[in-house]
Amino acid sequence: MGIAFGREICGDYHTSSSREWLVTNGIGGYASGTIAGVLTRRYHGLLIAALQPPLGRTLMLTKLEEIVHYHQQIYALSTDRWSGGKIEPQGYRHIEQFKLDGTIPTWRYACGDALLQKRVWMQQGANTTYVHYDLLRASQPIGLFLKALVNYRDHHGAIKSWGWQMAVDRVETGVKVTAADEATPLYLLSDQAEALTLHDWYYNFDLAVERARGLSDREDHLHVATFHLTLLPGHSITLVASTESSPELNGNTAFKQRQNYEQKLLNFWKTDRAFSAKNDPDWLNQLVLAADQFIVSRTVTLPPPDQIPVYPHSAALLSGKTILAGYPWFSDWGRDTMISLPGLTLATGRSEIARLILRTFSHYVSQGMLPNRFPDAGEQPEYNTVDATLWYFEAIRQYYQVTQDDDLVMELFPTLADIIDWHCRGTRFNIHLDPADGLLYAGETGLQLTWMDAKVGDWVVTPRMGKPIEVNALWYNALRTMARFSRMLGKPHQEYEAIADRTLARFSRFWNSEVGYCYDVLDTPTGNDPTLRPNQIFAVSLTETPLTPAQQRGVVDACARSLLTSYGLRSLAPDQPSYQAHYGGDPRQRDGAYHQGTVWGWLIGAFVIAHLRVYADPIQARQFLEPMADHLNNHGLGSLSEIFEGDPPITPRGCIAQAWTVAEVLRAWNATER
């Protein structure tokens, strides 16, 4: 695994401030920042704690301002950008190297002839961040000063201090910071350094990326303590930031635990792929580690019968798992979870995690629907999705294909049967089976129900009301899956087969013979929609394809000609009047381009599998995935982005680490090796 940069990247402000790192803790918390150390997003910080795992994410420790005293010289290792654009200090100039050690960001700072190494990681399962310094080389001891800047806000927000007084108290090995009476305390601890407490607001940090996103770009942070010590050559110090009062303080012990955890993940992957692991490129190992960052715990409470489940606040009855859709801002979404599950868990040798996720979401099924998302603020789950539930069937099918777990299928079968029943007779949002043609209809005015779900105020950018092609391809596959499960369990299967046969017979309505590919949506309020979008690729990539071989080839070729890029498929063909080549600006501008030409990385997986089905050339199919190896070095380091601009140079945008992009690259790579 070779993500590493020297001075040509680290010493240039533009490049070192645009490449971002991420570490996570398995319960929704994370730390994130730039190589330079400058804050450019409201989501940057050393401890963003999940106070209601996996949500309730709260910025607690923003950063450490690091200063080295050595040979009568003062070296400021931090980098800050202030209102007005001034960059001071410029610590990025001292970075000799940055690399990822697994997922652990590692810096080496050159201060004269001294070399100081820094690592940042989190404890799995705890809101605890470790910042560890090693003095690798020096001709005499250094003085190291660490100024702790804190906050206490939702990670989506931004704070102006307005005279906010936090309680800063000394504890045995550091300080305890309490932002308000009901706030969760932050402990800043080191058993090696002395701590001097302060209460000094730093005003007007400039968040350049937030400004580009049309959002508030100013923030204040509170300096609560300075830790200082004399560090000898060959010695180390660890600063621990935690919501726990007594975390492990030995940095070497904690670091070894983290390394062992990541090695275990790679062992799962390699054991599962013993037949081919020796031929895998190193960058796939980095993706396996990235895959784990999205898998988090979710505590489930079982609601009373016939009640819509609410976000769990009461006593836990089940310890479950879920998938965060993307860092830094997404929560767990039903659609993203089910699409991501095969690649993040099954493709990495972690079927037991897949089982937990499938069981977790079964408790949230309501009126035959999976939740669309769980809001960060802890309200009821939202159910405005037509496809998440159908992706649930596909995730279970792939899980069973790998595990042959009859017990889980038997457990979930009543839920699956209920889902089919609700869809046949009709559920929320006018989602129902049209008895006239056996196709699934979805939508009402003002709603967005498919994955192309951008909405600004009352403006639904891509309403797709009617019979979307990918929804009906998924519906057809769900019916065939249910028929197989029914036969396996000795239950009646004829009804599922009959509905599936009817869907198959009328799926031909999607074929647009005039252009040689499929309509995107049938029976919209204005007729059939002939717009070339990538959604039809799923009618080829899913196991049960309702298209003829000639139609499959037509779809793949059309997508390859007009939608394919190095990092995914465009959401709209460039020759369409609504095509948007640029993704940027304020929320309205961004959402207006989100599915109107913007490239989506996750779609490369379905394209590769569809191409493999049509052309039966695994070497060529795999070549479509190889540009992602370069992308691991360019945005969210060690991970894959959510979206990219539609025109060259296909600039990455959106989340720096997106679950379904990582998942689909892993899944598709596995498919090319079968």
Residue ranges and their predicted role:
Residues 1-674:
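Acidic, mature catalytic/reactive cores of soluble proteins
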